[in-house]
UniProtKB/Swiss-Prot annotation:
It comes from the Eukaryota. Gene3D superfamilies: Ribosomal protein l15e. This is Large ribosomal subunit protein eL15. The lineage of its organism: Eukaryota, Metazoa, Chordata, Craniata, Vertebrata. GO terms for cellular component: cytosolic large ribosomal subunit. Belongs to the eukaryotic ribosomal protein eL15 family.
Length: 204
């Protein structure tokens, strides 16, 4: 086995003494830094490479800190102005994952870069920490490489805002296997519409 395979096995055992100590120290270190900062290199090179990262020019890693917990509805003094069924303010759950929120914040901050993917690097009782892989699409090393030319096209601008990254697709219910049967047909809305539309064919 190569070195990355051993690293992958280490990260799978997060309750081991080594990983518990490492994650605890790293979380303390990340808390001292700003909520969004550039990392000199990926904390998990094996995971980053599996998600498309290469240690060459044009690739950037940003580390994001996202606050854990539910979402409070932003209304003045709890006045939602509606039916009682929609009066909820405190126990609201956000539709997307914290990982997709981290990708969005990185994409907003680095508007000239494209978000490729992201991965988890740690968490404590208050925060979750993610590292986001971004690509400089105007760098010659990216534009001239056939494997990365696809992300330089304009259609991939701010893909993290439109749920096109891996974390975003997961929140939209898109994927393969029995867990994603609610989105057969492209999206939840399309699947619901097809199942709830009565079609009376002429010859039936």
């Amino acid at each position: 086995m190569g070195a990355y395979k051993y690293m992958q096995k280490l990260w799978r055992k997060k309750q081991s003494n080594v990983m518990r100590f490492l994650l605890r120290v790293r979380c303390w270190q990340y808390r001292q830094l700003s909520s969004l900062h550039r990392a000199p290199r990926p904390t998990r090179p094996d995971k980053a490479r599996r998600l498309g990262y290469k240690a060459k020019q044009g690739y950037v890693i940003y580390r994001i800190r996202v606050r854990r917990g539910g979402r409070k509805r932003p209304v003045p003094k709890g006045a939602t102005y509606g039916k009682p069924v929609h009066h909820g303010v405190n126990q609201i759950k956000f539709a997307r994952s914290l990982q997709s929120v981290a990708e969005e914040r990185a994409g907003r901050h680095c508007g000239g870069l494209r978000v490729l993917n992201s991965y988890w690097v740690g968490e404590d009782s208050t925060y979750k920490f993610f590292e986001v892989i971004l690509i400089d699409t105007f760098h010659k090393a990216i534009r001239r490489n056939p494997d990365t030319q696809w992300i330089t096209k304009a259609v991939h601008k701010h893909r993290e805002m439109r749920g096109l990254t891996s974390a975003g697709k997961k929140s939209r219910g898109l994927g393969k296997g029995h867990k994603f049967h609610l989105t057969i047909g492209g999206s939840r809305r399309a699947a619901w519409k097809r199942r709830n539309t009565l079609q009376l064919h002429r010859y039936r």
